[in-house]
């Protein structure tokens, strides 16, 4: 299901009028088009079909850390900006390293809750690799929390893990490895 850009443009014009703006003034004339194009780009994840190639691997933990992402909060349609860290223990094959960031992009290109995003990435990595041993940690600043309401710049951290990552020592090993790539160090 694609984006109905005509309907978005009409709705944006109505919102502009509702907040007391003139949608025909110079700075706003193309805003409905810009918003429609932006929403089309930021919500096309359901159409993303990541192709996986499996390669010979090992049984050692594979980690891709510091994958930057942005997504829209489904409650306020405002951005979340953050990083994702992914680990899995291959059963015997690995996927191409670029596929993990592609999985993150796929699920971040839709209206999201951070906790759901984290689980979706974990489940897709598990499915793509055939591994039941996966851990994902996402950290994000929610602009809906930063610019309205509580006005706090505190990041939200969410984790999803399964299989061997239920062992706290393996989780700690993962967390220790990704420390240099954590949000507070990575986005500054």
UniProtKB/Swiss-Prot annotation:
Enzyme's top EC category: hydrolase
UniProt cross-references to InterPro entries, sorted A to Z: GTP-CH-I_C/QueF, GTP-CH-I_N, GTP_CycHdrlase_I, GTP_CycHdrlase_I_dom
SUPFAM superfamilies: Tetrahydrobiopterin biosynthesis enzymes-like
Gene Ontology biological-process annotations: one-carbon metabolic process; tetrahydrobiopterin biosynthetic process; tetrahydrofolate biosynthetic process
Entry EC number(s): 3.5.4.16
Pathway in which this enzyme or protein is active: Cofactor biosynthesis; 7,8-dihydroneopterin triphosphate biosynthesis; 7,8-dihydroneopterin triphosphate from GTP: step 1/1
Keywords: GTP-binding, Hydrolase, Metal-binding, Nucleotide-binding, One-carbon metabolism, Zinc
Binding residue positions for Zn(2+): 73, 76, 144
Pfam family, one: GTP_cyclohydroI
Any one annotated GO CC term: cytoplasm
Reaction it catalyzes: GTP + H2O = 7,8-dihydroneopterin 3'-triphosphate + formate + H(+)
GO function terms (MF aspect): GTP binding; GTP cyclohydrolase I activity; zinc ion binding
Subunit structure and binding partners: Homomer.
Similarity comment: family membership: Belongs to the GTP cyclohydrolase I family.
Descriptive protein name: GTP cyclohydrolase 1
Organism listed in the record: Caldivirga maquilingensis (strain ATCC 700844 / DSM 13496 / JCM 10307 / IC-167)
Encoding gene (name): folE
């Amino acid at each position: 299901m694609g984006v109905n850009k005509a309907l978005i443009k009409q709705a944006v014009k109505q919102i502009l009028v509702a907040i007391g703006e003139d949608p025909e003034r110079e700075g706003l004339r193309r805003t409905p088009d810009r918003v429609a194009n932006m929403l089309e780009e930021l919500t096309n994840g359901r159409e993303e079909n990541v192709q996986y190639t499996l390669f010979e691997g090992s049984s050692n933990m594979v980690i891709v850390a510091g994958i930057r992402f942005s997504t829209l909060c489904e409650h306020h349609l405002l951005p979340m900006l953050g990083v994702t860290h992914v680990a899995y223990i291959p059963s015997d094959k690995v996927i191409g390293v670029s596929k993990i960031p592609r999985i993150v992009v796929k699920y971040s290109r839709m209206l999201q809750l951070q906790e759901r995003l984290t689980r979706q990435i974990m489940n897709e990595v598990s499915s793509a690799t055939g591994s039941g041993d996966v851990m994902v940690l996402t950290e994000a600043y929610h602009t809906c929390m930063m610019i309205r309401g509580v006005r706090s710049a505190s990041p939200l951290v969410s984790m999803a893990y399964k299989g061997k990552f239920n062992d706290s020592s393996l989780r700690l090993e993962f967390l220790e490895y990704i420390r240099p790539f954590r949000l507070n160090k990575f986005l500054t």
